[in-house]
Design a protein with these regions (language model features):
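Extracellular/periplasmic carbohydrate-active domains that bind, remodel
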Residues: 2-292
Length: 292
């Protein structure tokens, strides 16, 4: 079966287009001179201002870096790095001002199902440059989290970015699905990435792939912009929704590439776009289907 991709982008009317460079710098745990550089357009800046999204580079201030390896992460794809991720999260989330939760590039970090909860003390960048992988065996999945893998809850002023990947290791889940084999019981499977009960969030340039079921869910959240995100799964992977948005308002998807198996690429439920002053958020979503 061919893999279907859906390329989506938003056109904003009457906004200038000019590239600027934003640079992030490190501090906590190490002097990190890493890839905290973001190419943004004035269009994006103006839209962020319109939605009251935070100014990440304000004043060129230093950011404190919480590197998961400083908390014991191995990154061999076999050792359980969950405790290291939790420790780095607790440190980054507790820092006032600007802080960075860093997943370094070049390694695969095995992380079990976990809820990363806020509120955090300051603005937070979640920099994913390596690959986060899920346990691949449904039989050993944490029974306390049957429908989620990486969950982010009750956050505000958070920026997810990086050239890394979130890999749900979903092949055994697909094989056990009743969609694949009608003799199998029909049971739910985890969502790879969930942002829930959060506001003023940006997600940029990440890859989410091989989701156990849904890849990326935004729920009960407000003022979220997702841009440059890639969602990938094999064409025969069952019920692997690409991006699922529910019970949320002011959510924008921009320049996303979605090839999410045989189920829905995008799903929107109970979305609300609000008036701000005498302005109304007006956008045009353009989708292009790509087969490969």
């Amino acid at each position: 079966m061919d893999t279907l991709h859906l390329l989506c982008f938003i056109i904003f009317l009457a906004l200038p287009l000019r590239l600027t460079s934003k640079q992030y710098s490190g501090g906590f745990n190490e002097d990190y001179d890493g890839p905290f550089e973001v190419q943004e357009t004035d269009e994006e800046d103006e839209f962020d201002e319109f939605l009251n999204l935070p100014n990440w580079e304000s004043g060129g201030r230093k950011k404190d870096v919480s590197n998961v390896e400083a908390f014991g992460a191995i990154g061999d794809g076999v050792s359980d790095d969950t405790k290291a991720f939790v420790g780095a999260w607790e440190k980054a989330c507790s820092k006032r001002g600007n802080s960075i939760f860093l997943v370094p590039k070049g390694k695969r970090y095995l992380v079990s199902a976990n809820k990363f909860k806020g509120p955090c003390a300051g603005q937070l960048v979640i920099q994913i440059d390596g690959t986060i992988v899920a346990p691949d065996d449904p039989k050993i999945w944490d029974p306390d989290h049957p429908r989620m893998w990486l969950g982010y809850y009750n956050l505000s002023n958070v920026f997810f970015q990086g050239k890394g990947a979130i890999d749900g290791s979903g092949s055994k889940w697909w094989a056990a699905s009743c969609k694949r084999n009608k003799s199998n019981p029909c049971i739910g499977a985890p969502t790879a990435l969930t942002i829930d009960s959060s506001s003023r969030v940006r997600v940029r340039d990440l890859t989410v792939k091989n989701g156990q079921q849904m890849h990326f869910t935004i729920a009960w959240s407000e003022t979220v912009r997702v841009s440059g995100v890639t969602v990938l799964a094999p064409g025969n992977s069952p019920n692997t929704d690409g991006i699922h948005v529910t019970s949320s308002k002011n959510v924008v998807l921009q320049n996303c590439v979605i090839g999410a198996g045989w189920h829905l690429a995008l799903r929107f439920i109970m979305l609300i776009f609000e008036l701000k002053g005498n302005q109304m958020l007006f956008c045009i979503m353009v989708c292009v289907l790509i087969f490969r």
